[in-house]
Amino acid sequence: MTTTAPAPQVYGGDEVATLVIDTGSSYTRVGYAGEDTPKLVVSTECGLMADEDVEMEDDTSNTTKKLNKYKVGDSANLPLPNMEVLHPLTDGIVADWDAVQNIWEYSLARLNADTKTHPLMLTEPCWNTQANKLKALEIAFESLEVPASYLVKDAVASAFAAGKGNALVLDVGSEVASVTPVIDGLVLYKPARRSQYAGDYLDRQIKKVLVSRGIDLTPRFEIKNKKAVEMGEPPVFTKRELPNVTHSFTDLQVSRILSEFKDSMCQVNDVPLTPEISGEAADRVFEFPTGYSTTFGADRLSTSESLFKPSEYPFDGETVPDTARGLSEMVVDTINASNVDVRAHLANNIVITGGGSLVQGLSDRVSKDVTQALSGLKVRVAAASNQEERRHGAWIGGSVLGSLGSFHQLWVSKQEWQEKGGDYLVEKKRFK
């Protein structure tokens, strides 16, 4: 984490640091504008205790009970009895505001931030709903009591993080992969594309392969002890006795294994895989929490190929429509659907961001595919080599924007909120 001081903003005659929150499907990033990386990154997936399992004093307030009911941060990774794991976002937008508000409040408390003195910048996807915009501002002004707030499109923020006012942003998140054109800092909505074939989808492909090979995916929290075994030998381990741990918690911990595999093992072939071109990948060894280890070669490529040709990698009992578009196809579709006057700008400024984009070879493959499909345009891809910059692109862009003095005029003040109301601000003024 960076140790540089937050960049101050002049607000109400005083210099204060802007708070920036980027709420993603898997992780929420919180920090101060002007810094290089977020101060805090917490899981957006949080725990929910049943009312009868919430411990509290007799005189505990309803607010404290509500906070105890939700388990956020490290406590969400504890195998607590009867704790269900919530996924507060659906299709990349907030569906459970109680959970998200708890995540924000927990994170800001960890920062010891006095929200009454800091403007708050929040990121949002370009397909966010009007109702969600209103709710985000309501929490900012009514619950957190911030003096000013602003909702910035995550694609715009990612473009600014890459130093671009014009860009075509390919964001591969956990739930959603999206392609968004940005011209002069504004989103072009009509040509934008998104799909569900993103990080979580790749995790499912990985799980399908591992299960087909008979690999035990027992998560770490269930393992009491294990013995070292030779590569390829069956694991030898003892399970913990943990009564009343929910399936949703176990599923979350298994997903952590799949994410580790994805980050360290998966690779995108430089050309599309076909029956004639199976691709070659050097064998790599992966050790599972049980102690079992084995090598993976071709599977490292075939799982990742699903991001580019999802219709060819269906799951049992499910049908992927033939019209499902892969990452490169969405980029090409978006450029072709954009006004002819901006296509060259977009093709020459493709920004790739998001944790799901860190699969080895993904950026090169997108570049080659798009160059081949759009031979009349000069294609240039920008993808941060630093993993943290790629994972936190939208937050970093929000940090850049929040530290600009020229951005000050765009803030919505609490006074405006109180005098004109959220409906006016959302529908008619700033955030439509």
Swiss-Prot record:
Pfam families: Actin (PF00022). It is found in: Nucleus. One of its GO terms (molecular function) is chromatin binding. The keyword Nucleotide-binding does not apply. The keyword DNA repair applies. It comes from the Eukaryota. GO terms for cellular component: NuA4 histone acetyltransferase complex; SWI/SNF complex. Keywords: Activator, Chromatin regulator, DNA damage, DNA repair, Nucleus, Transcription, Transcription regulation. Chromatin interaction component of the NuA4 histone acetyltransferase complex which is involved in transcriptional activation of selected genes principally by acetylation of nucleosomal histone H4 and H2A. The NuA4 complex is also involved in DNA repair. Is required for NuA4 complex integrity. Component of the SWR1 complex which mediates the ATP-dependent exchange of histone H2A for the H2A variant HZT1 leading to transcriptional regulation of selected genes by chromatin remodeling. Component of the INO80 complex which remodels chromatin by shifting nucleosomes and is involved in DNA repair. Component of the NuA4 histone acetyltransferase complex, of the INO80 chromatin remodeling complex, and of the SWR1 chromatin remodeling complex. Belongs to the actin family. ARP4 subfamily. This is Actin-related protein 4. It comes from Yarrowia lipolytica (strain CLIB 122 / E 150).
